[in-house]
């Protein structure tokens, strides 16, 4: 089966498409889209199905209309994987779906399945995962060596727009107590120098390292003693949860129902439900090398049930069941 992904963003093209390859499909990734690019790919690659994903430079209004027109003219099924739910369902995902008019939608948010169904949109749940060819345990790298690391964007403007967002609570539980107690945390990602209006703390400039290439993240996960995993929702996991564990990192994350549903705290990762508990856990595990190593190993084993190959196989099963594929 030939699958065409109309996408260019590193956080999207190095995950699910590789899972379909691992599942035995022939996969092509478009790169930046134009009418010429899409027309050429459809005629030369001759895909059986076309995927679009997430929120990127390839999901602008203009490109969404172009994708819809081109794929429908080729009489091919168009699938959209919604990775911005539930936060941006109304501001981004639904308007995009209305322009793309996909034949089927997968969403990372279970609670949105019923909502989309009531709107007449064919939909199923499909979570993030990780690709073991991208997120794997590497040798520690001196450039990224640190006691406590965070790989994430801060999103200060979005969080000021959504002051009740669970991500803020996660940040206040995991990061604020450490910074307030001058316990160094090394940050990779954008916007950490602008987070003070949201969290009420200023992160010291030497702790902030800026943008990190997506495919280099596992070097941090393999080199930091503790990785802080920020959660966006109570009922779903962030993408980096899977990626940190897949890279053999020692993960300290927020104590949420979904974390507990999928993993065993204290065995495969550790969780905190308060700033005080975060301080206690960090102080304990920074001294407990053997415990950290054991938990990391169990975590890497547990997360192997969440590879993108397995996600791809399940997507194909659903699409066949829904008669999108034959």
What are these regions (language model features)?
Residues 71-84:
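Active-site proximal beta-strand in glycosyltransferases
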Residues 308-326:
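C-terminal alpha-helical cap of glycosyltransferases
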